Design a protein with these regions (language model features):
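Conserved, single-site charged/polar hotspot
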Residues: 1-104, 109-354
């Protein structure tokens, strides 16, 4: 049987003192298994091998608020905020702002500044310059916004540049933003997606995130909202903080194989392919209630620390890249699409292998 579990100290000792390869380390601790590329495995949910941000990683549960800071402060990224449930006025203000028409803050109040901005937009697309949100104008805005790509809002994303610490707060009726002149405590849904431009990152609590899209979800959640990172499996592994980054690359390669296998197993276990989209992780109602995630970010699943782990030392990222797309498989039971739930620990006192 394969399920003995990797010990990290044992993997490090073997790799440091002999010619053990990462595959040999894995085969020692997980008997009768085979390392394969995901492309060689018939996956029940193949998006994990191809979709850029298929894996949803739980960062916080039942949050009442979060503070999000853009980094680096010297050259902060542009934020793109997609919020479901905006009123037509607030949604039109978001759209006009993203197109450079300057309707004023997104406050849901239709004043002269919003009306004038709307007239300018109507003129730019050949519509009657009524300055009001008529059906023709609203349909045109929604049609154009749909070209922006996947977004929780039918009006497209609100784009904020120049650096910011944004607060997202649940008030019991929904969520609102503050902390920037463009947002003005307008309550809408807590179904929110936040992305940032390439090269930048965001900080939430102790973690920094360079990759993925931040997701807030409140559907089927008992209180507040869950905070999740939708991220590519390889970029997720960059932030997996289970072994010191300076350890031997071969030992770290074994850890990368184990960590990737564990994450893929959890994804396949939780994901419902027919329901999975960029905006919906394809999770059961009970899983949505619990975390809106395929996998957690604490030691009870795998400890995910994000960008600060990625820059802690070159060996870990090299190990992830060296094993890119590879998982541990087993032809027997207790697997997901033959991918094992690869358990591991720091040390077991020498008692793992039969």
């Amino acid at each position: 049987i394969w399920c003995q579990g990797l010990t990290e100290l044992g993997a490090s000792f073997c790799s440091n003192t002999s010619s053990c390869t990462s595959t040999e380390v894995v085969n020692y601790y997980f008997k009768d298994t085979t390392v394969k590329s995901l492309s060689e495995v018939s996956l029940s949910s193949p998006d994990i091998a191809t979709d850029n941000n298929a894996l949803w990683v739980g960062l916080a549960r039942n949050a009442r608020s979060i503070n999000l800071t853009t980094l680096p402060s010297s050259s902060p990224p542009m934020l793109s905020i997609c919020q479901d449930g905006l009123s037509d006025v607030a949604g039109v203000q978001v759209f006009l702002t993203s197109r450079g028409f300057e309707p004023g803050p997104v406050d849901g109040a239709f004043g002269d500044k919003t009306s004038n901005a709307l007239k300018n937009y109507q003129a730019s697309v050949g519509l009657s310059q009524s300055g009001s949100i008529d059906t023709e104008t609203l349909n045109k805005i929604k049609s154009e916004a749909s070209s922006d790509g996947s977004c929780e809002s039918i009006f497209g994303p609100l784009k904020i540049s120049g650096g910011a610490t944004i607060n997202v707060i649940s008030n019991g009726n929904g969520c609102y933003f503050n902390g920037h002149p463009l947002v003005n405590r307008t309550t809408a849904s807590c179904n929110i997606g936040i992305s940032w431009s390439d090269g930048g990152r965001i900080r939430i609590g102790p973690r920094e995130h360079k990759h993925g899209v931040l997701k807030l979800r409140s559907q089927n959640v008992s209180s507040g909202f869950h905070v999740v990172l939708s991220v590519n499996i390889e970029k997720y592994l960059y932030g997996l903080a289970e072994m010191p980054s300076h350890w031997n690359v071969k030992a770290l390669e074994a850890q990368a194989l184990v960590g990737r296998s564990y994450a893929v197993y959890q994804y396949l276990k939780q994901n419902i392919p027919a329901q999975s989209t960029d905006l919906n992780a394809g999770l059961s109602t009970s899983r949505q209630a619990y975390c809106w995630c395929h996998i957690g970010s604490t030691a009870s699943s795998q400890y995910y620390y994000g960008y600060l782990k990625e820059i802690a030392g070159p060996n870990w990222v090299q190990a992830v890249n060296n094993t890119s797309g590879k998982v541990i498989t087993y032809s027997g039971g207790y697997t997901q699409s033959s991918v094992i739930q690869a358990f591991y620990s720091s040390s077991t006192g020498g008692k793992t292998n039969n």
